Amino acid sequence: MVRKIAIYGKGGIGKSTTTQNTVAAMAHFHDKKVFIHGCDPKADSTRLILHGKQQVTMMDTLREKGEDECTPDKVIEVGFGGVKCVESGGPEPGVGCAGRGVITAITLMEQHGVYEDDLDFVFFDVLGDVVCGGFAMPVRDGKADEIYVVASGEMMALYAANNICKGMVKYAEQSGVRLGGIICNSRNVDGELDLLQEFCDKIGTQLIHFVPRDNIVQKAEFQKKAVVDYDDTCNQALEYKELARKIIENENLVIPTPMTMDELEELTSKYGFLD
């Protein structure tokens, strides 16, 4: 049975990079059949898998050609490792609601039965926080079974992660969605690993993997490739291989217990953020 996973986190934390590198490792090292559904108006959730190809988005297709032309064969591309890719896209800048576009795109893909098409995993790469109903859809309506939050040892990254957990708690009972863990996309800040571990303990989940910072990620991006596509023998490729393995084998799925703002500030001040 296909597992549906949504990746959340603060804007700019590296969700799309982490998602694509993890998915590439799943396909390359673990022989998994994976589908990425980009849920960001920037439509950059699949560019490394597709070697920089600008994918036609579902919302552009709907606007320009209509729903009859917005079919899987017109909007899905296949990239590295046989990974299938689609981008929701969004409205024209300053017009309309991008969150509504996510709802429309996911619903259309479901109607076409795409997510059940002999897959092991579907990944929803979701924009930012869950303050908007459209971007909360994978949580609210049970479109995803598991949530992973990308964070770092920075105050605003933890603040966003905690807010995402609050959104999960609101909808977890009705949707059945659960938190699979926190992924640390390291920023090399002091005490980062210890801080993330303590944060995870307090919200009742696991630090599923600590991804170290490595310039090879940027080097691979310059070549428009995922790390495992660029060099599958390097240390960072093995980190993504390990993260992929942990997600594949993960059975520790929980409803989190978010911290209060006072508790979060107390935690971060312990590590010197509020000195």
Swiss-Prot record:
Homodimer. This is Nitrogenase iron protein. SUPFAM superfamilies: P-loop containing nucleoside triphosphate hydrolases (SSF52540). CDD domains: NifH. Its cofactor is [4Fe-4S] cluster. ATP binds at residues 9-16. It comes from Methanococcus maripaludis (strain DSM 14266 / JCM 13030 / NBRC 101832 / S2 / LL). It is an enzyme of class 1 (oxidoreductase). One of its GO terms (biological process) is nitrogen fixation. Pfam families: Fer4_NifH (PF00142). It comes from the Archaea. Binds 1 [4Fe-4S] cluster per dimer. Keywords: 4Fe-4S, ADP-ribosylation, ATP-binding, Iron, Iron-sulfur, Metal-binding, Nitrogen fixation, Nucleotide-binding, Oxidoreductase. Belongs to the NifH/BchL/ChlL family. Its EC number is 1.18.6.1. [4Fe-4S] cluster binds at residues 97, 132. Signal peptide: none annotated. It catalyses: N2 + 8 reduced [2Fe-2S]-[ferredoxin] + 16 ATP + 16 H2O = H2 + 8 oxidized [2Fe-2S]-[ferredoxin] + 2 NH4(+) + 16 ADP + 16 phosphate + 6 H(+). The keyword Membrane does not apply.
